[in-house]
Amino acid sequence: MAMSRKLKIRDLTLRDGQQSLFATRLTQEQINRVLPYYKDAGFFAMEVWGGAVPDSVMRYLNESPWTRLKTISEAIGGASYLTALSRGRNLFGYAPYPDTVLDGFYREAVANGLGIMRIFDALNDLNNVKSSVEKINAVGAISDGAVCYTVDPHYTITFMDRVKALFGKKLPKPIFTDEYFVEKALGFEKLGAKMVTLKDMAGLVNPSRIASLMPKLKQSLKVPVDFHTHCTPGYGLASSLMAVIHGVD
């Protein structure tokens, strides 16, 4: 059966790929060698900045993160949107920053070629991403709200636990349900995010779970939905294919 829609692919090799495999140590010279191939590939987007990149570029490589972004932008020449990953209120650092810092930082990032800012909070606290979504929209880039995926701890409920429940003991209940993730995604949409990503940074979502969750996200959201995962347990590719089958953009 022919596909009636075009799948948009975002490549993460130059940010999350090198961050996950060798601690974000790609030099500018190494990156420059592959940029012509990226321009020819014509991905919808490339995640090339943010996360640990700015810190590592300065701390370990003695290079400028702004030069990194601008050089990639000039080489790609609009063939793909350039993406960065922001920790919301924490930006690319490890402490919360005031709105004045967020405003200036995002403005400079867009001026140096950034097209999409993927924004997340590790606890899915929308209060920590609200300003970032608003400020990215205000400077003309695409705000991408990333909902962090995780799973509930495994609890073994014994017979005695059930007996104690009759006398008031509370049994553990699931927290990270499909409805939880849909609610967080809708929260991003309400804040003004132009797209939403289900971000599975630990590679925990299996194919059967994505087959359940992705249709609910697509049915609930008006904005495009992206899916990001890792292959830590070995089924990242299968989960990605299942996301495609169930309508991921």
Regions found by a protein language model. Give the residues of each.
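Conserved, mostly hydrophobic/aromatic
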Residues: I9, G17, Y38, I119, ...
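N-terminal glycine-rich anion-binding loops that anchor highly charged ligand groups
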Residues: S4-D16, L35-G51
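Active-site beta->alpha loop and helix N-cap motifs at the rims of alpha/beta catalytic domains
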Residues: A45, G50-E183, G203-N206
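Catalytic cores of alpha/beta
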Residues: D161-A165, E179, E183, P233-V248
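Short, well-ordered coil/turn segments that N-cap beta-strands
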Residues: S4-L7, G42-F44, G77-L82, G113-I116, ...
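N-terminal amphipathic alpha-helix/helix-capping segment at the start of soluble metabolic enzymes
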Residues: M1-F22, L69, S73-E74
